[in-house]
Amino acid sequence: MTLKLYSFGPGANSLKPLATLYEKGLEFEQVFVDPSKFEQHSDWFKKINPRGQVPALWHDGKVVTESTVICEYLEDVFPESGNSLRPADPFKRAEMRVWTKWVDEYFCWCVSTIGWAFGIKAIAQKMSDEEFEEHINKNVPIPEQQLKWRRARNGFPQEMLDEEFRKVGVSVARLEETLSKQDYLVDTGYSLADICNFAIANGLQRPGGFFGDYVNQEKTPGLCAWLDRINARPAIKEMFEKSKREDLLKRQNEKVA
């Protein structure tokens, strides 16, 4: 049995299957795809996922894409390994999937758009105008992604950013409403609902960040306690610590090369 996860590391959508692999205690090879080098658009990676997007899971010659789908796949294939991440009760499992659907269709998108506007801009501006257009037209297969790259380079409309910040506020309020009453998003315990939402919410609480006014101990104590609770889990701590070591080793090897 061979598992390889191609990802950007422990953040955003890449964190979902990465955390799931650690929670399940599965052996796997982590393959870092470097967005600063546009590796997700490279020919070698598009042989793995023709859409040029991470994460992607390689399992004995078969490739599974889409972050939440990968998480469910790992639970389906390895139900007895490590921690169970889906409620046994069908109704509670449905509740879990309402949360994973919501994060994929709403919460992730508003946070992602703001991340693209402010975090991806420097990467998108590394090339000349001519080089950028050639790269986007030749190597980015999805029209919607082409548009996002152009907006990241040239600037997102302010009214769009205002709307996405509004949606972040709505998202944070929904999470706080639930997490002020219970430890996890589904009251039967920790599940993929938590992993998938944690992947997007973790970091929003950083003081001085874009979202510090939305997520803090005063305004969202339940959400902050939930973030602390998940960050304290042994599997999550191992994920972050091992990823830091691998990143440091990679940087050292690049300096030697």
Curated annotation (Swiss-Prot):
InterPro entries: Glutathione-S-Trfase_C-like, Glutathione-S-Trfase_C_sf, Glutathione_S-Trfase, Glutathione_S-Trfase_N, GST_C, Thioredoxin-like_sf. The keyword Heme does not apply. Keywords: Lignin degradation. Gene3D superfamilies: 1.20.1050.10, Glutaredoxin. Residues 1-82 form the GST N-terminal domain. Residues 89-257 form the GST C-terminal domain. One of its GO terms (biological process) is lignin catabolic process. It comes from the Bacteria. PANTHER family: GLUTATHIONE S-TRANSFERASE GSTA, GLUTATHIONE S-TRANSFERASE-RELATED. Belongs to the GST superfamily. This is Protein LigF.
